Amino acid sequence: MHKLTKKGEISRIMHGLYTKTYYIDIVDEYFYPSVEEVVQKLAQKFNWTIALGGEATLNYTGVSNQVSNVYIYVSDGPSREYIYRGRKISFKHTNKKYIKQRSSKFAVLIEAIQRIGKRDLYDKRIKKLAFFAQNVKEDLLKDTSNIIFWIRNVLLKIKEINENK
């Protein structure tokens, strides 16, 4: 790896991760993988199940329009932080039952509900979450029996809203 790096055929992204280098003449720069690609490779390398986390879930679900400058993901692995090209990537450990054997959209929905919290879940936000939940493949009644009570209640409200449309 060291020799290939010295030759310029590959470049080290971070400890243990390398990429083939591509030079783009038009912009006179090297091409590097996106943060999302690096996140996926880290998850693959450590065999983690991951899903979007933090403030980004609120943006992704349509609850908020703020964009975080830190890339936060929930995972079934340990909590870790990495720096990639000046950007912080943070993996936060979460209970496996929220992300294992579930769709990534369902995991994002759960994370968004947790991020908002019990006290700040008012009707407008629940309706936005319900709109997002239309694309979730899990049954919000049957597939949520092992989820924390207050989160399950929110999911049942979301299911009710979507059924009444």
Question: Each predicted region: which residue ranges?
Answer:
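Hydrophobic/aromatic-lined pockets within catalytic cores
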Residues: 9, 62, 114
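A short, charged helix-loop
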Residues: 83-93
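Alpha-helix initiation and capping sites
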Residues: 29-36, 47-52, 103
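Alpha-helix boundary/capping detector
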Residues: 26-31, 44, 83-85, 135
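Short gly/ser-rich loop at a beta-strand->alpha-helix junction or flexible surface loop bordering the NTP-binding
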Residues: 12-16, 39-84
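Hydrophobic alpha-helical interaction segments
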Residues: 93-165
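Short beta-edge/loop segments at beta->alpha junctions of small alpha/beta modules
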Residues: 1-42
